[in-house]
Amino acid sequence: MHSHILPKTMPNWTQKFGYGKFIHLEPNADGSANMMQGGQFFRRIVENCWDEQLRIEEYKPFHTQVQVVCTIPVMFSYWAQTADALELSRFLNDHIAELVQRYPKNYIGLATIPMQDAEAAILELERAKSIGHVGIQIGSNINDENLSEEKFFPIFEACERLGMAVMIHPWQMMGFDSMKKYWLPWLVGMPAETSRAACSLIFGGVLERLPNLRVCFSHAGGSFLPTLGRIEHGFNCRPDLVAIDNPYNPRTYLGKFWVDSITHDIDALEYILKMQGSKRV
């Protein structure tokens, strides 16, 4: 399964770039830190978010051999100007690459790239591979555009060419402004976002055009696998709406992508294993 990590310190990007609500850290007296989005509190994090040795000690009791580490999705900054997002991506990617170099038996790194600009994204993708990253983590949508949009295809094509895996993580959740109560964007929106990404890549023909592209959908694929029957039914009964870019049944793609095992429920995990097979989880 994946996990998130940040450097212990980082620049105040909002002050440096002069706009936006970039994330920066404000340390607390108890050793924790506040993630600040511009000038607003976003989340409190504790030492295991940046202390690599503490993380190793924490996962030892679970007999975990290695952690896949990547940034926290709010750091993506796809809304930012390309040059600034690229600088931020390089900073985060260098941090993870250095971590993996120090602990090669304990960590595997996934990079972040400025998806809002394909040329810059591919340049950083190539650089990330050269410094030891084995893949990238990207959002479930890019500034509310689906991953099936043709502008993103060259990035996926480069990932296939370079052998760089793609882990898709939900972010910028649909319905965020209309269901803030009860933390629903994370509880309801996140699984839906992951299914949105899976459906987009399948129905948009990206997985068909790039059969060697290695894609992993986080959080066990979100709501995609549990609702595959409904998705397939829609494909069969309304091909005029669903099968307009790819004529193949979405069920045929089972086993052609990966999901991680983060279900928080043993029965759900057993269902995912039944659907995907253990080698794709």
Put a short name on every predicted segment:
Residues 1-281:
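Helix-coil boundary/capping segments in enzymes
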